[in-house]
Structure formats: structure tokens, C-alpha cells
Amino acid sequence: MLVVEYDFKTIKLNYCLVLLFFILIGCKSTNEVTTSPVKSVPIEELSSVDMKTWYQKDYQQDSIPGISLDKWYKQNNKKPKNKKIIVAVIDTQIDLKHEDLQGQIWTNLEEIANNGIDDDHNGYIDDINGWSFTGTKSGGYVVWNSFEYVRIVNNWGSLFKDKTEFQIDTQYLHKYRQYQRAVKRLEERNKYYRNWLKSLKYNIAVYPKVKDTLKYFFPKEDYTYHQLDSMYNKYKINSKTYKQRRDDNDQDLGALIDCMMANLEVNHKTLENIKDLEVQLDSVVNKSLNLIYNERLLIGDNPTILEIGYGNNNVSNTIKGVRTIQDHNTMVSGIIAANRTNEKGIKGILQNVKIMPLNISPSGDEHDKDITMAIRYAVDNGAKVINMSFGKEFSMHEDWVLEAFKYAEEHNVLLVRSAGNESLNVDKNESFPRDIPLGGLKEICGNFITIGSSTHKLDSTFVSDYSNYGKNNVDLFAPGGKIYTTSASNSYKSDSGTSLAAPMVSGTAALIWSYYPNLTVTEVKQIILESGTAYDIEVLVPGGEGKKVKFSELSKSGKVLNVYDAMELAKKVSKKKR
């Protein structure tokens, strides 16, 4: 499966020829749910209509391993006790004008719009619908962030460059090792992206000849990847690799087939697609990977301290000639809150919800400062759930973020994070933000859930091949493969990623609190984990080269989100507290 996110926050490309593009439950049990694990049963391929709503279905009723949302709505006849639950979505910018999000966006009623005054005295001027922590001094927005490992090399180089571990004081060893890892990663990524960019330039140069030549063999230009692949044997083409052809600037039939296969591998069917990706890769190389580039100069803050009020209030900014970055948040928010009653597009998890968009995620890695301040803003302004569909492999100021986690816990706020799309075991590989240190078992806080991605197929491919996993560091799985949701520019589309699995859980938590407001954050977390559906099947381990394990071994709960069972358990727990 190909997962392409053009903002380069998460890139998972099987680019084939071009080379390269989210135990026990750690808190006291609230109640026991005894459900027999579901065994694998072959199901028919879903229709295009069913694929748009598969994740809301129930396995027992529909033979589709969704989250049983439709089942709950069909049987529920009660009205929620809370009129509106606020869910903060810490992410990119958002399409505030999307038809399916009208009436679903949080409004700060204590603030008077556009008067240039901080009416509610929260430190943020004119924060009507949220805040952009990556908004610039000029009223614009940052499009390209540096990667965190670039920042580490930049900031810690004076301390550690050219030194051995024996020369480092023990109190700085952790930082030193992270610095060494960052240096290595920067070297690897520079090579990786420059090689990819070189390949794209080659593909662009030969593209007209590729189209003309293949039209001779396929007059209707209806060729598939596999048809092109079969031409190697049919026409006895030499066995040179793509890299060899590229470096030799070959333009024979083999080279032309190679280039088009590479384009089809990532669904780049037009020259415009390839040129757009070239522009983005050029920015990755010259901005995100550039030791000199500093996006914080555009914002005007001090990145070494925590402070209130930097950025701007425009969470849905569009500037002519500047790449927009609204798609990711719009997709995530639609899953949670798309209007269920307007007969348009899709139906979100719940109707009585308000999305609080908080921008921290341009292309590149999020800053720990922005993560921290966004969490605190969300808590201080009434959010009950915070969705964080982002992640990175380094963290300069993890202590800031963990303090924000605890601040949220003290205020009874749930944090939901996507596990990431690198096909990695995050029990053994660094992934931030997190609530359990690498190699540890104990949670730092009780209000944090990490979500992996599942598919609509209850077979060995049930776990999405891109999804990160971990018996200790991933709590639960939820549908994330081929999810049809809202998209930027008032549109809809299907996409995949753990980024789309996390809001399934965020929406469920909001739904629970809307009916059972007396529950604590630890109870809501426990309810969600305990009530999930267990599937007694063996699945392919993501990135495991064909290795299979029990599905239950890939997360702490060993389960998939089940809204119906979560609401039933929440009802029982809530009733006992009255």
C-alpha cells in the first residue's frame, strides 16, 4: 500500500525504481468486558459505496471489521447530556469553509473578532477559532519546518562535535547519543532526498519521450504497471538497474519503461504531478535539511523558551503563490465531526462536538515548543480531547511536552496520538511524543493513548503495512486504511495512515463524555481499551518481510476500537458512580 502525504510530515513510498517518499493496560481496571475473540472469516471485496463507510460498520452484523458506530446509533435513543464537547486537533491548518464542517468549528465566545485586543486575557489576540503557532509576523504561515535532527545537529554541535563518548560527562550522555544519532540521520536523509530529487529530474527530462514511445505499444495509453513489467522479457531488455539507467542518462526502451513504472508506483500519472513533487523535494533539501535555514525567524519567537502569544490567529490561511497546508487537519477533523444531519459528504463520529484547530504542523517536524503550547492552549480553553496525528523520531525538549501531558491529565483531558507510518516496532525505535520511555514499561501519565492502523480485510493484511506497532507503546488499533473523509478545498477523498486512525478514538472519547460527563480521563481511556474487539488471527508484521504473529501481540490491548461496546461499558461505569 502506498501512503503519500505531500506535506512530508509522513512519507512512506515504495518508490520501487526511484528508491524512495504514523501486555496489561497501565491503569486500574474499571470493569470487565468478556467477549470471545473474532476469528478470521473470508469476506467478499467491498463495493465502492461500502468502502466509503466501511470503518463505521460492525463485524458481527456486516462482516466488516469497523468500529461498530452505525450499530450504536441504530440502537441509541437517548440524547447527550453535554451539548458540545470540544476536541482540539493539533495539526496543520484547516479548511474552515468546508461544507461538512459548518457549525462544527469551535468559536471563542469571549473574544471579539478582529479588534486587535485580547478580550479574554488568555494571551492570544483575536483567537476566534483557535490559534496558529506557526503563523508568521506578517500574518502568513510557515510552509516548511526543519527536521528535528537538523535542529539537534545545529544546537548541540558546539557541545559534542568531534568528541567521543569518553569525553562526555555522564549527565550529558543521553543528549550526546541523541546528537550522534541525529548526525547519522541527517547524513542518511540528505543522501536519500538528493538521490530521489535526481531521479525525479531524470524522469521529467525523459517524460515526453516516455509518453510518445509507450503510445506506440498502447495507443489508448491504458497500460498498467504489470503490463509494463512484462515488456522486459517480451522485448529482451537488458537487466540494468534504474539507477544505472539514470546515471548513464539512458533513453532506450528499458529506461522509458522504468521511468513510467516508477511514476505509476506512486500514482504520478501526469508530468504536472512529477513536477509538483520535484518542487516539494527541492524544498525538503534546501529548507528542511538545511542547517542554515531557520523558519522561526519568520515567526519571530524565541524557540528556546516557552511563551504565550507568538504566531497568529489565522488557522485557515490561503496566500496566492504559497502552498496551502489545510488537507491533513481537514481529513482528521471530518472523521471526528463531519455534520451527521446535513445529508452531505460523510458522517462524523458525533454531531455535538466542536473542533478547535491548532496549527503546529507545516512540512517537516513539529517543534516541541509548539506541541507544548498547543496542548496548554487546548486545556485552558476547554478542550476535553486532544487529537495529535503527528510524530517524529527525535525530541529536543521532551521534558516540556511531558509536563504538558501532565497538565492535561490534571485537567481531565485525554490525549490521542497516531502511532506513525514507518512500519516500525516503537518499543524498539524512538517515536515522539510518547508516554513511555524507550525500553520502559511504566506510563508517565494516565491520559495518553497511541493508535495503530487497521484495514477492512480480516486476514493476514488486517494491520496496515505502514503502521507502527508495539506491545508496550501502541495501545489500540483503529481503522486507518482507505478512509473516505473530508478534504481541503471543500472536497472529499480516500486516504490512509495512522493519522486517520487516531481521530476514530478521539471522536469516541468525545462521544463517551457527551453522554457520561461524570467519567474521569483515566476511566475513559480504560473503557476504550477494554471494550475493543479482539481478533483471533495471525497478521503480517509491518516491515517484517513476511513474518506473521498473533494480532494481539502488536499492541497493549491487542484490540480494535469498538464504539458500541465502549458506550455500553461507559454506561455501566457511569451508573456505578452515581
Predicted regions and their residues:
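Short, low-complexity, disordered segments immediately C-terminal to signal peptides
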Residues: N31-P42
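Subtilisin-like serine protease catalytic core
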Residues: W72-V87, T92-H367, I444-N447, Y469-N473, ...
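C-terminal motif of bacterial Sec signal peptides marking the signal peptidase cleavage site
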Residues: L24-G26
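Extracellular S/T/G-rich loop segment that most often corresponds to the catalytic His/Ser-adjacent loop
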Residues: G300-T304, V413, R434-S514, N518, ...
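Mature extracellular/periplasmic domains of secretome proteins
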Residues: Y73-K81, R323-Q326, K347-L350, E366-N387, ...
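C-terminal subdomain of the subtilisin-like protease fold in secreted/lumenal serine endopeptidases
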Residues: E5, K28-E32, V379-F390, D399, ...
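N-terminal secretory signal peptides that target proteins for export/translocation
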Residues: M1-I11
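Active-site glycine-centered loops adjacent to acidic/histidine catalytic or metal-binding residues
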Residues: D91, G420, G497
